[in-house]
Amino acid sequence: MSEKEQKEVEAKESSGKAEERRETREKQVRGDVGIAWIYASYNNTIIHITDLSGAETIAFASGGMVAKADRDKPSPWAAMQAAARAAKIALDKGIRVVHVKIKAPGGYGPKTPGPGAGPAIRALVRAGLMVDRIEDVTPLPTDSIRKPGGRRGRRV
């Protein structure tokens, strides 16, 4: 065979492998899929895994469930432990793929997630869950919201 014919054969083989990979990935994604809701504030981190509709709770864990002291609840360590606990329960119940939705307090509170958001996602992946997409669902005010305390602030 000439070099040109050999390259054509290799191209056909490689495209077939790519199609196979696509098909196997689609099969994996179509399996049991859930949503991992991560609420990360500066006081705590809550991981809540539900089915795709969001109506049925599959697993739940928070930083307060694994931390011994209140000051440790929002820490990255507590978030990782809580995410690993929730992921283990979800894997036992048959969830393999999760869509991650991160939420910060929002509104008139902070719009950025707390320190446990990133480590929680990392722990979900390490526990064996496949993360399909990551989305930020922090509630943002569309005007008409005012900080508590009024115009002159909180008088102590």
Swiss-Prot record:
One of its GO terms (biological process) is translation. It comes from the Archaea. Keywords: Ribonucleoprotein, Ribosomal protein, RNA-binding, rRNA-binding. Residues 1-27 are annotated as: Disordered. One of its GO terms (cellular component) is ribosome. GO terms for molecular function: rRNA binding; structural constituent of ribosome. Pfam families: Ribosomal_S11. The keyword RNA-binding applies. The keyword Ribosomal protein applies. Belongs to the universal ribosomal protein uS11 family. Located on the platform of the 30S subunit. NCBIfam families: PRK09607.1. HAMAP family: Ribosomal_uS11. Part of the 30S ribosomal subunit. This is Small ribosomal subunit protein uS11. The lineage of its organism: Archaea, Thermoproteota, Thermoprotei, Thermofilales, Thermofilaceae. The gene is rps11.
